[in-house]
C-alpha cells in the first residue's frame, strides 16, 4: 500500500509509522487520519511493536487549520468518523505502541501521542493543549487521558491556560515516560522499541488489557482478570522460555507465542 502523508517501515518485528507533512508541522488532515488508521491496522498483522513519530521539527501540530478542504467541516462528524477510529486503533491495539515525540505536539497532536502506551520525547519537544486558544475544548481523547495521567488539577491547568509543557516537565509530572537529550533521542527510542519488538508479545497484550480494565473494574473483578490472564500466560511458550533462560542465566529468546 502506498501512502502520501505518512511513511511506513517494518524491520525485525518493528513497524515505524512516521507522520510526514513536515511543511505544516505534520498537521492532521483527513488523508493523514485515514492513512494512520490503515497503517496501524496493517501493523497489527505484520509487527510485534509499533512506533509513531514525526518528520522534521514537529511531532504533530494538531488539526490542519489551513486545510482548505476542512472549511465548514462539522467537528462532531470529523471526531466521530475520523479521530475516534484512529485513537481506538492505537488504544485497543494488542501490540505495544510507543510514541517517539521528536518536537512540538499540540492539540490533537499531543493527544495522539498520549494515546500510545509509552511516550518518549526529545528534551526540546513540548506538549500543549492548545484548544482554548481558538475557542475549543480538548478533544481526541484529551479529556479522558489527561486527568488519569496527571490528575484533575494539572489537567485543568493544561486545558484552561493552554501553555507549553516542556518534555522534562512532562516526564516529571507523569504525562510521559521519559525525556531524552536530543543528541541521543533516535538511538534511544529505537533501542526501547527493539526491546518491545523482541519481547513476550502475549504478556505485553495482557498488560495492556489488564491496565485498561483496571481503570473501571472493582478490585474483585480485577483480581479475577489477573488470575485468568496469568493462567493463560502460564501456558505460553514464552513463559517456558523465560523460566528456562532464568535458570540457565542467559537472555530469553521470546517468539511472541
Curated annotation (Swiss-Prot):
Its EC number is 4.2.1.17. It is an enzyme of class 4 (lyase). InterPro entries: ClpP/crotonase-like_dom_sf, Enoyl-CoA_hyd/isom_CS, Enoyl-CoA_hydra/iso, Enoyl-CoA_hydra_C. The keyword Lipid metabolism applies. It catalyses: a (3S)-3-hydroxyacyl-CoA = a (2E)-enoyl-CoA + H2O; a 4-saturated-(3S)-3-hydroxyacyl-CoA = a (3E)-enoyl-CoA + H2O. One of its GO terms (molecular function) is enoyl-CoA hydratase activity. Keywords: Fatty acid metabolism, Lipid metabolism, Lyase. One of its GO terms (biological process) is fatty acid metabolic process. The keyword ATP-binding does not apply. Could possibly oxidize fatty acids using specific components. Belongs to the enoyl-CoA hydratase/isomerase family. This is Probable enoyl-CoA hydratase. The lineage of its organism: Bacteria, Pseudomonadati, Pseudomonadota, Alphaproteobacteria, Rhodobacterales.
Amino acid at each position: 500500500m502506498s501512502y502520501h502523508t505518512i511513511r511506513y517501515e517494518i524491520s525485525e518485528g518493528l513497524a515505524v509509522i512516521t507522520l510526514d507533512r513536515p511543511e505544516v508541522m505534520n498537521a492532521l488532515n483527513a488523508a493523514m487520519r485515514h492513512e494512520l488508521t490503515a497503517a496501524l491496522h496493517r501493523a497489527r498483522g505484520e509487527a510485534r511493536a509499533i512506533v509513531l513519530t514525526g518528520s522534521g521539527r514537529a511531532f504533530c501540530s494538531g488539526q490542519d487549520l489551513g486545510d482548505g478542504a476542512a472549511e465548514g467541516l462539522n467537528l462532531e462528524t470529523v471526531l466521530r468518523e475520523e479521530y475516534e477510529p484512529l485513537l481506538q486503533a492505537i488504544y485497543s491495539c494488542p501490540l505495544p505502541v510507543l510514541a517517539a515525540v521528536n518536537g512540538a505536539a499540540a492539540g490533537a497532536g499531543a493527544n495522539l501521542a498520549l494515546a500510545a502506551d509509552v511516550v518518549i520525547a526529545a528534551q526540546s519537544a513540548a506538549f500543549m493543549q492548545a484548544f482554548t486558544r481558538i475557542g475549543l475544548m480538548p478533544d481526541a481523547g484529551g479529556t479522558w487521558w489527561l486527568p488519569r495521567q496527571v490528575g484533575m488539577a494539572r489537567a485543568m491547568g493544561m486545558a484552561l491556560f493552554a501553555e507549553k509543557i516542556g518534555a522534562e516537565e512532562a516526564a516529571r509530572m507523569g504525562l510521559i515516560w521519559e525525556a531524552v537529550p536530543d543528541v541521543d533521542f533516535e538511538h534511544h527510542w529505537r533501542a526501547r522499541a527493539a526491546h518491545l519488538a523482541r519481547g513476550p508479545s502475549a504478556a505485553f497484550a495482557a498488560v495492556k488489557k489488564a491496565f485498561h480494565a483496571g481503570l473501571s473494574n472493582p478490585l474483585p473483578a480485577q483480581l479475577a482478570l489477573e488470575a485468568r490472564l496469568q493462567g493463560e500466560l502460564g501456558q505460553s511458550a514464552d513463559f517456558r522460555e523465560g523460566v528456562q533462560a532464568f535458570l540457565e542465566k542467559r537472555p530469553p529468546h521470546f517468539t511472541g507465542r
